[in-house]
């Protein structure tokens, strides 16, 4: 579970990346689609899954908007992110293992673009946060 220190580190780190969050989301999604091509099945309705695709850019922005919302609701992720869980479980029927894959790609992208801020402490706390968010997103599957 997230400690008070974890929460403080996550909030501070997200504050540093917030201005580039859309680009982080876009790159993380591109990485996921390229490195884990099986994830493309959830986006088969898009006409273009290339890195320059408008759909991919838009969804990257959507992803990071949800992460930002979760940072704001860090003290009650399950209650605060219930709609996200409902959407992915009941409407989109996304395999919950994909949340972990996306989280990993968000971490990689943050490490690449924010090396000075992505300290080992931040890495651990942000990873724990994304794991908690992934678990929350998968909550309705249980």
Curated annotation (Swiss-Prot):
Heme b binds at residue 88. O2 binds at residue 59. Keywords: Acetylation, Heme, Iron, Metal-binding, Oxygen transport, Transport. Residues 1-142 form the Globin domain. GO terms for molecular function: haptoglobin binding; heme binding; metal ion binding; organic acid binding; oxygen binding; oxygen carrier activity; peroxidase activity. One of its GO terms (biological process) is hydrogen peroxide catabolic process. Pfam families: Globin. CDD domains: Hb-alpha-like (cd08927). The modification N-acetylserine is found at residue 1. GO terms for cellular component: blood microparticle; haptoglobin-hemoglobin complex; hemoglobin complex. PROSITE patterns: GLOBIN. Involved in oxygen transport from gills to the various peripheral tissues. This fish has two hemoglobins: cathodic and anodic. The cathodic Hb and anodic Hb display small and large Bohr effects respectively. In addition, the cathodic Hb displays a reverse Bohr effect and appreciable phosphate effects. Belongs to the globin family. Heterotetramer of two alpha chains and two beta chains. This is Hemoglobin cathodic subunit alpha.
């Amino acid at each position: 579970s997230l400690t008070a220190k974890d929460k403080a580190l996550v909030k501070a780190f997200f504050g540093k990346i917030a201005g580039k969050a859309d680009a982080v989301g876009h790159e993380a999604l591109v990485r996921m689609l390229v490195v884990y091509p099986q994830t493309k099945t959830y986006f088969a309705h898009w006409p273009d899954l290339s890195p320059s695709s408008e759909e991919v850019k838009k969804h990257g922005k959507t992803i990071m908007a949800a992460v930002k919302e979760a940072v704001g609701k860090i003290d009650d992720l399950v209650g605060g992110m219930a709609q996200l869980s409902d959407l992915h479980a009941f409407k989109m029927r996304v395999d919950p293992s994909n949340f972990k894959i996306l989280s990993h790609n968000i971490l990689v992208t943050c490490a690449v673009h924010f090396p000075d801020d992505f300290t080992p402490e931040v890495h651990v706390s942000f990873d724990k946060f994304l794991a908690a968010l992934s678990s929350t997103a998968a909550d309705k599957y249980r």
